[in-house]
């Protein structure tokens, strides 16, 4: 009988949970926006963990690119600290090296949603005007 989750999936899930708590509680850098850890992918040999995050910086909501770059730099500089804290929380022989990546899927989904709404509004206004012209 096959297992539902592999060991790598369980390790990645545990790293994601612990890392989200550590970032929220331990990192106090003002350049760091509200960071959400979306997913973690662990290499087969557990040497690397690719951490995908999204950033909401309330000061720079319009200028999302600069805020996310600054937050990524903060996370990259704190990677050693976060790795050592993860080592205390999760018992592994080797704690993976953390590599942070900006996950653009959320912002892409918002942009696509806005485009769909815009297209629907345009279609409904076009159908309303064509209905008026036929009457």
UniProtKB/Swiss-Prot annotation:
Keywords per UniProt: Cytoplasm, Ribosome biogenesis
PROSITE patterns per record: RBFA (PS01319)
Gene Ontology molecular function, alphabetical: ribosomal small subunit binding
SS bonds (residue pairs): none
InterPro entries xref list: KH_dom-like_a/b, RbfA, RbfA_dom_sf, Ribosome-bd_factorA_CS
Listed GO biological process terms: maturation of SSU-rRNA
Principal location listed in the UniProt entry: cytoplasm
The keyword RNA-binding appears for this protein: no
A cellular component annotation (GO) from this entry: cytosol
UniProt-annotated location(s): Cytoplasm
Function summary: One of several proteins that assist in the late maturation steps of the functional core of the 30S ribosomal subunit. Associates with free 30S ribosomal subunits (but not with 30S subunits that are part of 70S ribosomes or polysomes). Required for efficient processing of 16S rRNA. May interact with the 5'-terminal helix region of 16S rRNA.
Family the entry assigns: Belongs to the RbfA family.
Quaternary state and interactors: Monomer. Binds 30S ribosomal subunits, but not 50S ribosomal subunits or 70S ribosomes.
Protein's recorded name: Ribosome-binding factor A
Gene (UniProt): rbfA
């Amino acid at each position: 009988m096959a297992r539902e989750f592999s060991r790598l999936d369980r390790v990645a899930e545990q790293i994601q949970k612990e890392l989200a708590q550590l970032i929220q509680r331990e990192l106090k850098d003002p350049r760091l926006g509200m960071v959400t850890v979306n997913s973690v992918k662990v290499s087969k040999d557990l040497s690397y963990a690719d951490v995908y995050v999204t950033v909401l910086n309330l000061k720079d909501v319009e200028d999302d690119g600069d805020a996310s770059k600054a937050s990524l730099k903060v996370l990259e500089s704190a990677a050693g600290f976060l790795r050592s804290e993860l080592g205390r929380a999760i018992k592994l022989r080797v704690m993976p090296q953390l590599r942070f990546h900006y996950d653009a899927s959320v912002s892409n989904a918002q942009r696509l949603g806005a485009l769909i709404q815009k297209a629907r509004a345009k279609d409904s206004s076009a159908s309303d005007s064509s209905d008026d012209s036929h009457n």
